[in-house]
């Protein structure tokens, strides 16, 4: 494979980067989206975070939500979780929510390319997928885990179809 074969894909990925930051320009000024669920998560996870800071260990139970529940559903940090590093690499370390828009674009583009769709049509399809209104609604609501799942779904489908 020579550079002329991958050149259009490199250009399109660079376009995805440009669009991700152009759409979320306030990120470049240090601003962040204040999603409702993210704000409430800060309060829900305070007891767990305080315990982590004071003991250096992870709490496995919290009393600060629903009269008590397992902490792993809220804020346990797993040091052996390598997926977070893979996510950082694939999303190029971009801040949220630009990373999510980039993943939406890249994921659907890769899916369409794996289906042997022309790269120009694949790029248009990626923009159509990424700019679905629901994706931005869940970002504003603070549903970051759901947004990540939706962003990676096309890549999972591409991997299944490719094998």
Predicted features and spans:
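Membrane-helix interface "capping/anchor" motifs
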Residues: 113-121, 163
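Membrane-interface coil-to-helix junctions
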Residues: 20-111, 127-154
